[in-house]
Swiss-Prot record:
It catalyses: adenosine(37) in tRNA + dimethylallyl diphosphate = N(6)-dimethylallyladenosine(37) in tRNA + diphosphate. InterPro entries: Dimethylallyltransferase, IPT, P-loop_NTPase. It comes from Legionella pneumophila (strain Corby). The gene is miaA. The keyword tRNA processing applies. GO terms for molecular function: ATP binding; tRNA dimethylallyltransferase activity. NCBIfam families: miaA. This is tRNA dimethylallyltransferase.
Length: 313
């Protein structure tokens, strides 16, 4: 049991946070957040960060660890998460990793690939091509060269599009090949519990309702406060978080409120689609439909069964 790590993964708005808080009442878990948006301070509403009350009941590690103008990589996450896992296990508890940043889960469990260093000449060539042809053209090129990676990143995520194409041009191999290749893996046994709503319409409706709730709770004001406090630019990694980019563009006068709302909801649904793509191909995951009544009871029973078997063995 001293090498057992549970992972609760799933798309945005599938109910991960509420379930994680419930699991803490049944098991000696300590929660590590696996969310590339919740790492940022002052970004609370738009990231659906657990409430103060929830954090008092169920503290989360790796929340509020970076300023919005800072960056954070999958490699940094692995270092932090593995260190926390060791500390939690040393205290006699069990790590529970909760979130939807599938690239972090992948890097943690399968190891990080040794990717080539950035090449200024290749990057300049790609930027010139983007200026002349547009980033949509480069995204389509990536979709042809590496459809697996293209399906996992947003069509407007220029930084990741550029990096994926750069890796291909430098090595002749796709980024997805690197990520799925054999790497040094941590000495833990990961149990992957995946929330996987079968009805996309149910998830889409929840996403729309949650985005509207965020707007009502002051999402726009939160972005304005970020602008007042930090030198916020649209190309910052923090502004890749869904909703923030759309509100920034709305505040800049690029489109009206209703268009911003529609774009924010659409971007969140696209994020959920990419997360589900990761999960669909996740080997050995235990899938639960969070739309079903009693799914949490099924998960609790499975965890108890795994822990009982681990102790008896």
């Amino acid at each position: 049991m001293n090498k057992l790590v549970f992972c609760l993964m799933g798309p945005t708005a599938s109910g991960k946070t509420g379930l994680a808080c419930e699991l803490l009442t049944h098991f000696p878990f300590e929660i590590i957040s696996v969310d590339s948006a919740m790492i940022y301070r002052d970004m609370n509403i738009g990231t659906a960060k657990p409430s103060i009350h929830e954090l008092q009941r169920a503290p989360h590690y790796l929340i509020d660890i970076k300023d919005p103008v800072e960056s954070y990589s999958a490699a940094q996450f692995c270092t932090d998460a593995l260190s926390l896992c060791a500390e939690i296990i040393k205290r006699g508890n069990i790590p529970l990793l909760v979130g939807g940043t599938m690239m972090y889960f992948n890097a943690l469990q399968k190891g990080l690939a040794t990717l080539p260093e950035a090449d200024e000449a290749v990057r300049k060539r790609l930027e010139e091509e983007a200026l002349s042809q547009g980033w949509d053209f480069l995204y389509q090129k990536l979709s042809q060269l590496d459809p697996v990676t293209a399906a996992r990143i947003h069509a407007h995520d220029t930084q990741r599009i550029q990096r994926a194409l750069e890796v291909y041009y430098l090595t002749g191999s796709t980024l997805s090949t690197y990520l799925t290749g054999p790497h040094e893996q941590p000495d833990y046994y990961f149990v992957n519990l995946a929330l996987f709503p079968e009805q996309r319409s149910w998830l889409h409706e929840r996403i729309a309702q949650r985005f509207d709730a965020m707007l009502s709770e002051g999402f726009i004001e939160e972005v304005q406060q970020l602008q007042a406090k930090w030198p916020i630019q649209i190309n910052l990694p923090a502004m890749r978080c869904v909703g923030y980019r759309q509100i920034l563009e709305y505040l800049a006068g690029h489109y009206d409120y209703e268009t911003m709302r529609e774009k924010g909801i659409a971007a969140t649904r696209q994020l959920a689609k990419r997360q589900l793509t990761w999960l669909r191909h996740w080997e050995g995951a235990l899938f639960y439909d969070s739309q079903n009544v009693g799914f949490n009871t099924d998960i609790i029973a499975k965890i108890r069964e795994i822990l009982d078997n681990t102790v008896s063995n």
